[in-house]
Amino acid sequence: MSETAKKVIVGMSGGVDSSVSAWLLQQQGYQVEGLFMKNWEEDDGEEYCTAAADLADAQAVCDKLGIELHTVNFAAEYWDNVFELFLAEYKAGRTPNPDILCNKEIKFKAFLEFAAEDLGADYIATGHYVRRADVDGKSRLLRGLDSNKDQSYFLYTLSHEQIAQSLFPVGELEKPQVRKIAEDLGLVTAKKKDSTGICFIGERKFREFLGRYLPAQPGKIITVDGDEIGEHQGLMYHTLGQRKGLGIGGTKEGTEEPWYVVDKDVENNILVVAQGHEHPRLMSVGLIAQQLHWVDREPFTGTMRCTVKTRYRQTDIPCTVKALDDDRIKVIFDEPVAAVTPGQSAVFYNGEVCLGGGIIEQRLPLPV
């Protein structure tokens, strides 16, 4: 580290990963400060609202490490740039991924700008399980060392410029190591469970929460053969490949296998189901993606061989990618894939390197 230590602002969520990130950066000689972002205005007293507890934990960690904790409210930015689009996608019958949008608009845009302009930061840091590597003057996004926790899928919209201004200390570690460091340091977050639920909104009852903002429109549930076997409470509550929560568990036909959502007919408000998690109607040979983001920001032309994930924690799928125009690509899988879901993201890899990705516009069904 140079004589004048570089200043890093760590996004402190009140969790173990950001806590340990701050300590690791201190050990590396950086001048470290924390920032707690409030991105949702609580409108109830439900137990799912944990912002106050998270702030208290973040403050306790910063006090223990001897660093300053700043706070900022990005609720307006979150509503305008993340939540409204999230609702619009659900209304259109698609299944969006708010965490990806939140990283794009809040953590690596609003936070990055605030840290640089208002707090004089040289870098920001987060507790994401990813790594960066600088190659040929550009910063690359790499998978986290812990393949169980790798979060590169959620960060594919970042540009090489944003990655160059970001540090990911826990990306070089495995989760048990991170927890052990926190325990050894006596941090209050050491045994805190990992957060789940919608980015920044927390662990609310999703159906109830969504119902506040979008009116439910009940409709028919039909089989692939056209038989009506039930009623859904709203297409927005269902996604392709879903098994639980359909309310038709006792309905037996044919194979007696469980029912899965295989299609959503938005125009007619109909949910289509079939039996078996590998039913041909659930399988796709490829997809069309749009709203492309390539980490190196170079336009993609021609074709390439790589691997793709169509959802988080999925095993990499070998595929061929072909450019259709500036902002659309066609992806053909080597083998058919189940539950490819419009609105979700397709993220591409070359080995450890995350190349970028796009939003799934449509799936290319298996010919039957």
From Swiss-Prot:
Sections of the chain in a coiled coil: none
Gene3D superfamilies, alphabetized: Adenine nucleotide alpha hydrolases-like domains, HUPs, Translation factors
Annotated region (Interaction with tRNA), positions in chain: 149-151, 311-312
Pfam families assigned: tRNA_Me_trans, tRNA_Me_trans_C, tRNA_Me_trans_M
Assigned EC number: 2.8.1.13
Subcellular location: Cytoplasm
InterPro entries hit by this protein: MnmA-like, MnmA-like_C, MnmA-like_central, MnmA-like_central_sf, Rossmann-like_a/b/a_fold
One Gene Ontology cellular component annotation held by this UniProt entry: cytoplasm
Binding site for ATP: G11, M12, S13, G14, G15, V16, D17, S18, M37, G127
Protein name listed in UniProt: tRNA-specific 2-thiouridylase MnmA
Natural source organism: Shigella flexneri
Originating gene: mnmA
